[in-house]
Curated annotation (Swiss-Prot):
Subunit structure: Component of the mitochondrial large ribosomal subunit (mt-LSU). Mature yeast 74S mitochondrial ribosomes consist of a small (37S) and a large (54S) subunit. The 37S small subunit contains a 15S ribosomal RNA (15S mt-rRNA) and 34 different proteins. The 54S large subunit contains a 21S rRNA (21S mt-rRNA) and 46 different proteins. bL36m has a zinc binding site.
Entry coiled-coil feature ranges: none
More details: Present with 500 molecules/cell in log phase SD medium.
Taxonomic superkingdom: Eukaryota
Membrane-crossing segments per the record: none
Name the UniProt record assigns to this protein: Large ribosomal subunit protein bL36m
Mitochondrion found in the keyword field: yes
Xref: InterPro entries: Mitoribosomal_bL36m, Ribosomal_bL36, Ribosomal_bL36_sp
Pfam families noted in UniProt: Ribosomal_L36
Described function: Component of the mitochondrial ribosome (mitoribosome), a dedicated translation machinery responsible for the synthesis of mitochondrial genome-encoded proteins, including at least some of the essential transmembrane subunits of the mitochondrial respiratory chain. The mitoribosomes are attached to the mitochondrial inner membrane and translation products are cotranslationally integrated into the membrane. bL36m may be involved in a process influencing telomere capping.
Taxonomic source organism: Saccharomyces cerevisiae (strain ATCC 204508 / S288c) (Baker's yeast)
SUPFAM superfamilies with a match to the protein in the record: Ribosomal protein L36
Location within or outside the cell: Mitochondrion
Segment annotated as transit peptide: 1-35
Gene (name only): RTC6
Amino acid sequence: MFLQTLRLTMPRMFLHMKPSPITITRACTVPSLLSVAAPQPALVAANRPLVFNRGFKVRTSVKKFCSDCYLVRRKGRVYIYCKSNKKHKQRQG
């Protein structure tokens, strides 16, 4: 009984309220949480492959760890790169 009364009176409660032009503009321009769908993980993974780039270890003295490591001098700094193990990347700081 209460739910029927509530259901019938709810639309009448809002009849006297008229939306202002600002409210209408906000409703049209500001996306609500309900209208914006969250990206699904399967779609995100399909669009962008996950590529992890290793950063440089910043050290005062750099050294080669294996035979594949090689030294490069750029921008006044010494860099160590490695073809076989990306963990060996270093930058002299």
